[in-house]
Structure formats: C-alpha cells, structure tokens
Amino acid sequence: MGCGPSQPAEDRRRVRAPKKGWKEEFKADVSVPHTGENCSPRMEAALTKNTVDIAEGLEQVQMGSLPGTISENSPSPSERNRRVNSDLVTNGLINKPQSLESRERQKSSDILEELIVQGIIQSHSKVFRNGESYDVTLTTTEKPLRKPPSRLKKLKIKKQVKDFTMKDIEEKMEAAEERRKTKEEEIRKRLRSDRLLPSANHSDSAELDGAEVAFAKGLQRVRSAGFEPSDLQGGKPLKRKKSKCDATLIDRNESDESFGVVESDMSYNQADDIVY
C-alpha cells in the first residue's frame, strides 16, 4: 500500500497558512508532494514535527514584530515592569524609592551646592558677637582696580588721632599768651577813651559857667538901671500899675533865668504904664 494513504493527514497537520498582509518569505510550503518512494514513516513524522515547530516560531516572530500584538506565551505587564525595574536597578540607572524626607533633604543639599558653586553663598563663615561676616573674593581679571581719590585719603588722615608732643603744647601756650595780650590792649584802649571823654565835658562845663556868670552880671546891671520916675512937683515917686503883660513878662524872665536866657528890657519903658 505504501505511504499513499498517509499523505492527506500529514498535509492537514501542516496547515497554518499566513494571514493577508504578511511577508511572503514566511509562507509555508504546502504544495510539496511526499511520495512513498522517497520517505519512510519515521522520516515523515520527523518532517511533520519540524515543520510545525518552524511554523510556530515564525508566527511568534511575526506577531512580536507587529505593534500591539500579544502572544500566548508573553508575560503579564506586571511581570514585565518588575523585570525592567530590576534590570535598571542592577545597572544603577534608577535609584531605589526613598521617603519624602530623604528626597527633600537631597534637594536642599543640591541647591546649596549649586549656590556655593555660583558664589552666592560661601561655605566658610566667621561668626562674631555683633553679627556675621563673610569673606568676599573678587576676581579682577578684566580690569585692574583704581586707586581711591585723594579726598578720601584726606578724610582718613583727619580721622587718625595724633599723640600730643611738647612742641604742640608750647605752640598752644604761645597762642594763648598772644590772645591774652590782645585782649589786654583792647581793654586799655577802652579805658583811655573813657578817661578822655570826662575831661572834654569838664572844659565844656567851665565855658558854660563863665557865660552864665556874664549873663548874671548883665541882668544885675539892667535891674539896677531900671527906670523909676519920681514926682518932681511933690517930690514923691510915681506909682505904676502892674498890668497883665508885666506879670507874664516877669514869669517869663524868671523861667529864662533858670535856663540862662535873658530878654531885652524894652517892655519896661512903655509910655502907657506911666501914671500921671
């Protein structure tokens, strides 16, 4: 009978035809006839087994190459994540999960290191009683620093306190003596001027006294030479009535005598005042 009747069963076992759109190089050869002359039953079984294994391997490769495909033997997503994390941890690419406190500390330390590298914060600081002081270093590679102006130098020199020497003390003593002498001279000049003023006043007063004496003498002469008519017929002196004008003139004369002023005696010799 031979291998003839076993050919259709073997062909049925080989079937898994590729789907549409797959590559042609992975297609299974189903059209190859197996004759009884060229193969034995053992060889046929081995061939069928090899062809089935090859077809399954090709299917797995093709399914894995396509995006979004999941094979029957593929692991679950949780197992894949575990494997990936374990591989990364072993390679040192990912750190182990840490607590929030350790993460915050690490971030703050990184920030401090960056600030120190930039020069904003300095690592070493000297603490004093009154406060803190930092050592600031400036890089003067671009331009050299200029000297401060002379005005600042003068101010610094003024602020410095000098020790007193004997020469300074002697100079101060001499200056004090000169001031004392000048003050004494000024006082003497004032005293001399005050002494000269009363002598001038005394001479003026003497002149005034002489003039007053002369005026007094003149007044006495005028009074002694006053006109007093006598009655030639009866030998009696004529009487004169005093008028208001005479009273006012007498009062004026008295007041003028107090001031050293004398009026003329023309008013005494008036014809109206004589009574016959």
UniProtKB/Swiss-Prot annotation:
Lipid attachment site numbers (N-myristoyl glycine)? G2
Which positions fall inside the SLD domain? 118-244
Keywords (alphabetical) are:
Lipoprotein, Myristate
Recorded source organism is Homo sapiens
The protein's name in its UniProt record: Stathmin domain-containing protein 1
Skewed-composition ranges (Polar residues) = 68-78, 87-100
A Pfam family (short name) is: Stathmin
Query: Which Gene Ontology BP terms does the record give?
Result: regulation of microtubule polymerization or depolymerization
Positions of the UniProt region annotated as Disordered: 1-40, 61-106, 226-250
Lipoprotein keyword on record:
yes
Q: Which PANTHER family match?
A: STATHMIN, STATHMIN DOMAIN-CONTAINING PROTEIN 1
Which InterPro entries does this entry report, sorted A to Z? Stathmin_fam, Stathmin_sf
Q: Output the PROSITE patterns linked to this UniProt entry.
A: STATHMIN_3
